[in-house]
Amino acid sequence: MSLRPFETPGGLSSLSPRRRDFSPTRPGTNGPSAKLEHVTERFAGLWTDLEQEKQNKRIQESTRFSLLQESLQRIEKSVEAEVKRRAESDKQLQSHFEGEIKTLQERQLQQFTDLQLALKSAVESLNQRITDLHALVRDERESRRSDIEHLATSLVGKVNECVAAIDEERNGRVQEQTVSMKRVGEDLMLLSQRLDTEKNTRDSEVSALRAEVHDAIGNRNLADDQFKGAVLDEVAGLKAALALEREERIAEDDEIVQAVNDYTKALQEGLKLVSA
């Protein structure tokens, strides 16, 4: 019987593609040899199955590769046909667009020619209108010049009349202003006299008021000095009271500390007696 090699008893780690034939001895149907032969037969069947599966996979891959090549050939033919069809279509589109562009160019050229003719006619008409307008402006200028000369002559006469009237009015106003200034001067003189009298009266009143204020300030300074002395006396009394209270508190604190020390000493002596 032919056997396949195996490596580990825990599982199949690797199978060799080559077979090793050997003929084991069969000492008996029962025992370790029979079990080993049974295991060997099972591995031999597994090897055969693996070889068959490998062969089937190769056949399937070969068939799949053949189908893939046929598909690629069909795709290449389809692509070539599509490329040819698109090339023909591009040529047709190019010829169509060239015809359309040529027609459009001819149409634009015709429109440009018509527009140029219309523009030329409009420019000629505009030139004629400008010429007519220049003639009208020249005639209007001559007419306006004569009118302006006539108006200037009449305006000079009116200006002279206005200047004479203004001079007459100016002389009248100068006389009126002279009379008014004389009256204002007299009024200012009377007002100045009244102001001087009022100033003297106010100065005398201010002097009297200043004397009264000076007397009031002197009395107030005396009252302030008296108040300041009273306040200083009260402050000194408060300072003395505070010092006395501080000394009393210090004495009380010393007495409290001495009492605490005496109590602590007595407590320590009592503890010593208890411990003894």
From Swiss-Prot:
- Keyword annotations from UniProtKB, A to Z: Coiled coil, Cytoplasm, Cytoskeleton, Microtubule
GO cellular component terms?
Answer: cytoplasm; microtubule
Ranges for the region named Disordered are 1-37
User: Where would you find this protein in the cell?
Assistant: Cytoplasm, Cytoskeleton
By its UniProt entry, which InterPro entries does this protein fall under?
Answer: SF_assemblin/giardin_b
Organism domain of life: Eukaryota
Q: Which residue stretches, if any, does this entry annotate as coiled coil? A: 67-145
Domain comment from the record reads as follows: Consists of a small non-helical N-terminal domain and a rod domain with a 29 residue repeat pattern based on four heptads followed by a skip residue. This alpha-helical protein is characterized by the ability to form a special segmented coiled coil and to assemble into striated fibers of 2 nm protofilaments.
Q: What is this protein called?
A: SF-assemblin
Ranked from the top, the taxonomy reads: Eukaryota, Viridiplantae, Chlorophyta, core chlorophytes, Chlorophyceae
